[in-house]
Amino acid sequence: CAVSFAPITNLTGLINTMERNEGFKVYEDYLRSDDWTFDQASPLENIDKINVPILLLHGDRDLNSPIIQSRSFYNKMDKAGKNIKYKIFKDGDHFLSNEEHRIEFLKEVEKFLKQYL
């Protein structure tokens, strides 16, 4: 099983939405320097290879990892009939700054791990 909080599941999608600055160019050049592509490294494009239950959690106000990353992944996994549970933290940020969110996160993870381990 796997637990993922605020994942980047689509590298191409992320790169296309990132601010273009000098640091971005170095990052992009590094990632594109090998034979593999962003798509080959993106979980969103490798759904067929995923064969474990996944718990996916994300805050809907995450400014570091856009929630579309989780939504797209969940939708594609669900459509493929994969075992995935998706939890959105309303008004949640990337750092689980809200204490209630942290407690809820830990409870969800504990419940999921007890079920699959």
Indicate residue ranges for each PLM-predicted region.
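Active-site-proximal cap/loop segments of hydrolase catalytic domains
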Residues: 1-117
